[in-house]
A protein has these predicted regions:
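Short, charged surface segments at domain edges that flank catalytic/cofactor-binding sites
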Residues: 1-24, 43, 47, 70-73
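Short metal-binding segments enriched for Cys and/or His
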Residues: 58-70
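Pre-Walker A (Motif I) flank of P-loop NTPase domains
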Residues: 72-77, 142-144
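Conserved nucleotide-sensing/catalytic segment adjacent to the nucleotide-binding pocket
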Residues: 96-166
Length: 235
């Protein structure tokens, strides 16, 4: 990642055009910007231009780590839901023939296809594989169609993944299986604990849609989305 200084004259034009508030708004954002951030990362060929630069706070710029704004390279989707949710059915009508799906459950099955119960070590390995794949694809400059599938929108390194996804304009879909249906299943101890954590978040599609709409309005004001792009994609 390049850390050279942008021409002060270009920076002045960026501030005059787009303002000096952090454009990212990641969890923990300082709001007041102190750094120049490339929408198309410099590593992807992004230029030092008014069109490609926005101001960011140091915290958010470091947290972004060259992840692309969805559509400026890979187009990113996320599907979240409680344990045993039918993730495949939720995505079925939207997947393209070349879509890439990163699913924790699928990775876990691939690691232990002959075991009915995964050990903590295998679950950790699957989680690390998911994180690595998601991180790599989120930085891709190629026009990939990426679907990230998991239950809890958080991890030790990223305690508020949902806010990060919304900041980068991922299309987030919530599977709203009633708690009574999930807890009626023959859940493992780990699944039961995860289900408790999931329902404690009280996530709904309506609430997530409202946050995504507000973010897309902000991106439109920053010249990064057109007015007709601010509505949530139809599922």
């Amino acid at each position: 990642m390049r850390r050279q200084t942008v021409d002060p004259r270009i920076r002045s034009k960026v501030i005059a055009t787009w303002g000096n508030c952090c454009w990212l708004g990641m969890p923990g954002c300082s709001i007041t910007a102190t750094e120049d951030d490339h929408i198309i990362p410099f590593s992807h060929g992004g230029k030092d231009t008014v069109a490609n630069l926005r101001r960011a706070c140091k915290h958010c710029n470091a947290m972004r780590q060259d992840r692309v704004l969805s559509g400026y390279g890979a187009t990113m989707h996320v599907v979240i839901g409680p344990p045993r949710a039918d993730f495949g059915m939720a995505m079925q009508s939207m997947l393209r023939r070349d879509s890439i799906v990163v699913s924790f459950d699928s990775l876990l099955r691939d690691l232990c296809p002959t075991q009915s119960k995964a050990s903590d070590g295998l679950r950790l390995a699957a989680a690390m594989a998911w994180d690595g794949a998601a991180r790599t694809l989120a930085k891709s400059s190629e026009p990939l169609d990426v679907w990230l599938v998991r239950t809890l929108p958080r991890s030790r390194r990223h305690p508020d993944m949902l806010s990060e996804w919304i900041a980068l304009d991922y299309d987030v879909h919530v599977i709203e299986t009633p708690a009574s249906e999930t807890f009626a299943l023959d859940l493992s101890h780990q699944e039961y604990r995860t289900a408790q954590q999931w329902y404690s978040l009280h996530l709904t599609q309506q609430a997530v849609d409202a946050r995504m709409a507000a973010r897309r309005q902000r991106l439109a004001a920053l010249g990064l989305r057109h007015g007709d792009d601010t509505a949530r994609p139809c599922w």
